[in-house]
Swiss-Prot record:
Family: Belongs to the metallo-dependent hydrolases superfamily. MTA/SAH deaminase family.
Molecular function in Gene Ontology: 5'-methylthioadenosine deaminase activity; metal ion binding; S-adenosylhomocysteine deaminase activity
Name of the molecule in the record: 5-methylthioadenosine/S-adenosylhomocysteine deaminase
Function noted in UniProt: Catalyzes the deamination of 5-methylthioadenosine and S-adenosyl-L-homocysteine into 5-methylthioinosine and S-inosyl-L-homocysteine, respectively. Is also able to deaminate adenosine.
EC number: 3.5.4.28, 3.5.4.31
PANTHER family assigned: AMIDOHYDROLASE-RELATED DOMAIN-CONTAINING PROTEIN, AMINOHYDROLASE SSNA-RELATED
Originating organism: Acetivibrio thermocellus (strain ATCC 27405 / DSM 1237 / JCM 9322 / NBRC 103400 / NCIMB 10682 / NRRL B-4536 / VPI 7372) (Clostridium thermocellum)
Length: 431
């Protein structure tokens, strides 16, 4: 379907940070065909749908670069705990009760929440990833999914085969909406041979790795006791960092760790809400950016956030570093927005395809209703998005050239059915 968006104010997130007013944007066969402020650009374009964006702001869809979407089932459960108590004492025991079908419904709820809050792409690491892929395929969202070749140490060969099969089935499927990486949960759950094997598998099938890195001080202390080196150092030693990497958190990096991550081209995912809620700390994002490290944003799971709202992550990322360092110039609005769009696209392996509004890019966009009291007057659109906008301001979402939400109505998800099923699942597993 060819879509024309007219009367559009557009934040492009391109290299020049262009912001256009009263522009026309054409979508053809899932790609951005043109962007122009002159009506002459329309003469050769035949639109199947015309969207009048007067009073709305068009911008790239947000990229949630680290989450566990099926954990919506555990939302508002086991709060106010340190990571180790939260994970080992509460979350893991409940997760043992979750069935593949449970994960399917939990993921659908997460996707519904993400689309309604302007997220068009996400990176997911969780259980029963076949069901996560099914939910992604049905809903039209874009995703980087990962699967481990070592789910069960007693069945490593069988799990490795299933990992290869998963990659073959889902990688680059659905018009390229799905990418598949290798899951390496963390250094504290994977021993050195497992880390090496995972790196070898990623190299063999030419893909990347999604891993948690140095989220807490305890993780760093335990790694130093066990290996005599930091998690970043052991990842470097075992080959984990020799492939494209999505490294979630990276809260406690020494200068040496940061040098490794910079030199290896590791993508860091900043999860400010989750890190604060679990008392993990605050990542040195400004130092990372000054070192040329690509930093994107993520929500983490709804069990530790407790939502999947990327507007909150942008807002918080733009505030906490100013306060901690007593420097209001750190992580400006434009920087926070780039972290949630183009940087996220690069981190997830979609760089050059999404994350900005430019001719030839895939049409992943959102329209924000700017006619709201809390946004008036707009003055600076980028600042308005980062500092004033709410997720509920997202009116329309387009992914891969398809309208998946319009006038806040989801087109690919039965929202009420999903909510009903997740409530029933939560009653069963949390009792």
């Amino acid at each position: 379907m060819n879509i024309l968006i007219k009367n559009a104010d557009i934040i492009t997130c391109n290299a020049s940070d262009d912001v256009l007013q009263g522009a026309f944007l054409g979508i053809k066969d899932g790609y951005i065909d043109f962007i122009d402020t002159k009506e002459d650009a329309l003469k050769d374009f035949k639109a199947d749908r015309i969207i009048d964006a007067k009073g709305k702001l068009v911008m790239p869809g947000l990229v949630n670069a680290h989450t566990h979407s099926g954990m919506t089932i555990l939302r508002n459960f086991a709060n106010d705990l340190a990571l180790e108590d939260w994970l080992f004492g509460n979350v893991l025991p409940v997760e043992e009760k979750l069935t593949p079908e449970d994960i399917y419904w939990g993921t659908l709820l997460g996707i519904a929440e993400m689309i309604k809050s302007g997220t068009t792409t996400f990176a997911d690491m969780y259980l029963h990833m076949e069901e996560v892929a099914r939910a992604v395929s049905e809903t039209g969202i874009r995703a980087n999914l990962c699967r481990s070749p070592l789910k069960d140490s007693d069945k490593s060969v069988e799990d490795a085969v299933r990992c290869f099969e998963y990659f073959k089935k889902w990688d680059n499927s659905f018009n390229g909406r799905i990418k598949v990486y290798i899951e390496v949960h963390s250094v504290y759950l994977f021993d050195e041979p497992s880390l090496r094997m995972s790196a070898e598998v990623a190299k063999e099938i030419n893909t990347g790795i999604h891993i948690h890195v140095q989220e807490t001080l305890k993780e760093c202390e335990d790694s130093n006791k066990k290996y005599g080196m930091s998690p970043a150092e052991i990842c470097c030693k075992t080959g984990i960092f020799d492939v494209p990497v999505i490294a979630a958190h990276c809260v406690h990096l020494s200068d040496g760790d940061m040098g490794i991550i910079r030199d290896k081209g590791v993508n860091v995912i900043h999860n400010p809400t989750s890190n604060l809620k679990l008392g993990s700390g605050i990542a040195k994002v400004d130092d990372m950016l000054k070192n040329g490290i690509n930093v994107a944003l993520g929500t983490d799971g709804a069990a530790s956030n407790n939502n999947l709202n990327m507007f909150e992550e942008m807002h918080l990322a733009a505030l906490i570093h100013k306060g901690v360092h007593m420097d209001p110039t750190l992580i400006g609005a434009s920087c926070a927005l780039k972290m949630a769009t183009v940087n996220g696209a690069k981190a997830l392996g979609f760089g050059g395809e999404i994350g900005e509004i430019s001719k030839g890019m895939k049409a992943d966009l959102i329209l924000i209703d700017m006619d709201k009291t809390h946004l008036c007057p707009v003055n600076d659109p980028v600042s308005a998005v980062v500092y004033s906008a709410q997720s509920s301001d997202v009116d329309t979402v387009i992914i891969d050239g398809n309208i998946v939400m319009e006038n806040r109505e989801l087109k690919t998800i039965d929202e009420e059915k999903v909510k009903f099923n997740v409530k029933e699942i939560a009653k069963r597993v949390l009792r």
